Amino acid sequence: MIRSVVRGMGAALPRRIMKNADFEGMVETSDEWIVQRTGIRQRHIAADDETTASLGEAAARAALANAGLTPGDIDLIVLATSTPNNTFPATAVEIQNRLGMHHGFAFDMQAVCSGFVYAVTTADLYIRGGLAKRVLVIGSETFSRILDWNDRSTCVLFGDGAGALILEAGEGAGTIADRGVLAASLRSDGVHKDKLFVDGGPSTTGTVGHLRMEGREVFKHAVGMITDVIEATFSAAGISADDLDWFVPHQANKRIIDASAKKLGIAEQKVVVTVDLHGNTSAASVPLALSVAVADGRIKKGDLVLLEAMGGGFTWGAVLVRW
């Protein structure tokens, strides 16, 4: 059977690093307050010349170099983002052009922080359906553009960045020992749409708007939703938490990460955490964390890796991959 096998990874971060202490003169907060509640110590913030497209392009080029491929080898680009360069055309098309790729097709996917997990699942379906042999999956965000910098409950949480992964068609035996995407589960429930949202848009206010969040409400639902979708993914693959080599969760809040891992029985040493370095980068969160763990040698060929994310909507999901 056809499997979607990981061929390469890449990442890109804005030049500017903003430490927690930098917020102390802007809003009523402190490094201690932020670290205690979120685990975040710093985040990268895009300069005027750094955009979702430019960061996505840089991550894509890094992934291509890592895979030993060129843009000509890619059939499809799927970009997960909630902060596109323009309302239209899709920022994926702009990245396609920046890469000099004038064949195949490209589109954006919007599932907020769950975007990359949704995008990997979608890319897998295109590959297994025979419509693409190699897919460049990108998560790229510039959330700093939609933050209310006077709202201490949100402005300290988010950062900018991009990560990319290349999937390619490979042969598998149809067992859990296969390399590639092995199982996935996706969920959404719009009843929660007002708990995490942006208060603007072209069809409503004609403005970009700012991010708004009911933090306690998000936390209240997060752990249960995350563990349920992961357990569904385990069931689909016929495995348990003990079989995992690595858990790469959405990097939103260290307390949510810890509580989810504990509830699932995943050992702390198997959890990849980069929220302290990047903050919450929405759809870029999971591929950035993946890139760190691949680059430092933790994730190796043959490892069983679980990706998970939850975002506004609510949307949430999990993907199981044999590296």
From Swiss-Prot:
GO BP annotations, alphabetical order: fatty acid biosynthetic process
User: What's in the domain note?
Assistant: The last Arg residue of the ACP-binding site is essential for the weak association between ACP/AcpP and FabH.
Cell cycle as a keyword?
A: no
Q: How does it assemble?
A: Homodimer.
Active-site residues, record numbering mapped to chain: 113, 250, 280
What pathway, per the record? Lipid metabolism; fatty acid biosynthesis
What is this protein called in UniProt?
Beta-ketoacyl-[acyl-carrier-protein] synthase III
**Biological role:** Catalyzes the condensation reaction of fatty acid synthesis by the addition to an acyl acceptor of two carbons from malonyl-ACP. Catalyzes the first condensation reaction which initiates fatty acid synthesis and may therefore play a role in governing the total rate of fatty acid production. Possesses both acetoacetyl-ACP synthase and acetyl transacylase activities. Its substrate specificity determines the biosynthesis of branched-chain and/or straight-chain of fatty acids.
Cellular component, GO annotation = cytoplasm
Q: A GO molecular function for this record?
A: beta-ketoacyl-acyl-carrier-protein synthase III activity
Q: Which UniProt keywords apply?
A: Acyltransferase, Cytoplasm, Fatty acid biosynthesis, Fatty acid metabolism, Lipid biosynthesis, Lipid metabolism, Multifunctional enzyme, Transferase
Where does the record say this protein resides?
Answer: Cytoplasm
User: Where is region (ACP-binding) located?
Assistant: 251-255
Q: Which reaction does it catalyse?
A: malonyl-[ACP] + acetyl-CoA + H(+) = 3-oxobutanoyl-[ACP] + CO2 + CoA
Q: Which gene encodes it?
A: fabH
Matching entries from CDD domains are given as:
KAS_III
Indicate the family of this protein: Belongs to the thiolase-like superfamily. FabH family.
**EC number(s) stated in the UniProt entry for this protein:** 2.3.1.180
What coarse category fits the chief subcellular location reported for this protein? cytoplasm
